Amino acid sequence: DIKNGGKLSKKELKEKEGNLILKSLKNSDYVILLDDKGLALTSIEFSELLNKNMVSSANELVFIIGGAFGFSESVYRRANTKLSLSKMTFSHQMVRMIFKEQLYRAFTILEGEKYHHE
C-alpha cells in the first residue's frame, strides 16, 4: 500500500506502485503480469508455460497482481508475459485464491496426479 495513496491521481498512484514493483525485481527475473488483457490459457497450457520457463531458464518466475487501477507503463514494458485469469475484474483477495489454485493445479498436471480432469 502507498502512504496517502487516496490523495494521488490514478496515474500518479500507478506510477508510484510501478516504481515500487520495479525496485523489487532483479534483472534476471521472468515477470508475468496477471492482467485481464493478457493471454487466456487453459490449465494445461498454463502448466506447460510454467514447465517451459522452469526447465529452460535459471531466472526466477515472478507473478505480479496489479493495483486497483492496473499497471504503470513501465511495469508493462518490464513484463515478459501477461496472463489473464479472466476478462472479469476480481479483488486482490480473489485473484490470490484463484491463482493459488491454478498454480496447484498446474503442478499436479506436471506431476501426473489425478487432480485435474479434462
What name fits each language-model region?
Residues 73-117:
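Structured adenosyl-cofactor binding patch, chiefly the S-adenosyl-L-methionine
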Residues 37, 67, 94:
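Conserved residues at beta->alpha junctions
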Residues 44-59, 86-93, 114-118:
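A short, terminal or domain-edge coil/loop segment
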Residues 2-59:
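S-adenosyl-L-methionine/SAH cofactor-binding core of RNA-modifying enzymes
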Residues 61-63, 81:
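Generic beta-strand structural signal
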Residues 66, 72:
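Rossmann-fold NAD(P)-binding glycine/threonine-rich loop
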